[in-house]
Design a protein with these regions (language model features):
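C-terminal active-site "lid" helix and adjoining low-complexity regulatory extension at the edge
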Residues: 171-189, 198-203, 212-243
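Short Pro/Gly-enriched beta-strand edge/turn motifs at strand-loop
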Residues: 6, 93-103, 189-195
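Phosphate-binding site of ATP-dependent enzymes
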Residues: 33, 61-164
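Short, surface-exposed charged micro-motifs
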Residues: 117, 209-211
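A conserved helix-loop-beta module that forms one wall/lid of the active-site cleft
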Residues: 1-47, 69, 82
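Short acidic-glycine loop/turn motifs at beta-strand connectors
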Residues: 52-56, 120-124, 154-156, 213-216
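Intrinsically disordered, low-complexity Ser/Thr/Pro/Gly-rich regulatory segments
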Residues: 150-179, 194
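A short, polar/proline- and glycine-enriched secondary-structure boundary/capping micro-motif
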Residues: 48, 136-145, 172-173, 230-235
Length: 243
């Protein structure tokens, strides 16, 4: 759907739908040094595993973990069983190419890929935040797991407020960068992608997650039908007056 309306997205390498297909993982990722395994119906960033490289014995995750083949196969199996899905329902495992993320945010994010979440109401960007990975979050840009959320002005992209664990902060806990110095290149393009997500899905209220690839520019990672309330905490104010 995204490709049909010219929205950049990571390439889908493969899909594992059944337990008997788990053993085919290595064949699916052949030719890819780095990739991402994620549940199709996950929430809160649960179940997302970013593999940076692998050899004949181990997989190496973006968070620095060394995983055996058995560990990763079990992770995929758990995904299919619904361990990470909403309501614990049976799920499928999506395998995508990893984003070659831009280094413009290297001072603001610890290891993992930072992303921009655009809340879109009836096709119009209403609130925006950037989520920055930390050591505590394991390199994941997820506020529930300890990432930093920075509320951004929709019109300018300038930082307005920053939080971690629902508390206001000024510096990134690991890099010590001043979060008010954060700037997002291609700001207009981020907002356009968010608006196009409405055209693609028809959802009156959604959250579009967008990352900045070094070579391809802004790319949409996913669209959330229930994006949650964390963005209001990142802004330090509610969304009622914006909808």
């Amino acid at each position: 759907l995204a490709n049909s309306i010219n929205i950049n997205t990571p390439k889908m390498i493969g899909i594992i739908e059944h337990q008997y297909q788990v053993k085919n993982l290595l064949d699916i990722v052949k030719g890819y040094d780095t990739f991402v395994i994620k549940p199709a119906h996950g929430s809160g960033g649960k179940g997302v595993l970013v593999i940076k490289e692998y050899d004949a014995e181990h997989f190496y995750s973006a968070s620095g973990d060394v995983l055996s083949f058995k560990d990763v196969y079990q992770h995929v199996s758990n995904t299919l069983s619904g361990l990470f899905s909403l309501g614990g329902k049976y799920d499928v495992a999506l395998i995508e190419e990893a984003v070659n993320f831009s280094d413009v945010f290297k001072d603001f994010s610890y290891h993992g890929v930072p992303d921009v979440r655009v809340i879109v109401y009836k096709g119009f960007p209403a609130m925006v935040m950037m989520r920055l990975a930390t050591k505590e979050s394991g390199g994941r840009a997820n506020l529930h797991q300890g990432a930093v959320g920075v509320g951004l002005d929709v019109r300018t992209g300038q930082p307005l407020n920053a939080v971690m664990h629902n508390k206001t902060i000024l510096q990134h806990p690991d890099t010590k960068a001043n979060l008010m110095d954060l700037r997002v290149p291609f700001w207009k393009e981020h907002l356009i992608i968010g608006s196009l997500a409405y055209d693609m899905t028809g959802l009156g209220y959604l959250g579009a997650d967008i990352v900045l690839d070094k070579n391809r520019g802004p790319m949409m990672l996913e669209v959330n039908a229930r994006p949650g309330l964390a963005i209001q905490i990142a802004h330090g104010r509610g969304s009622k007056n914006r909808l």
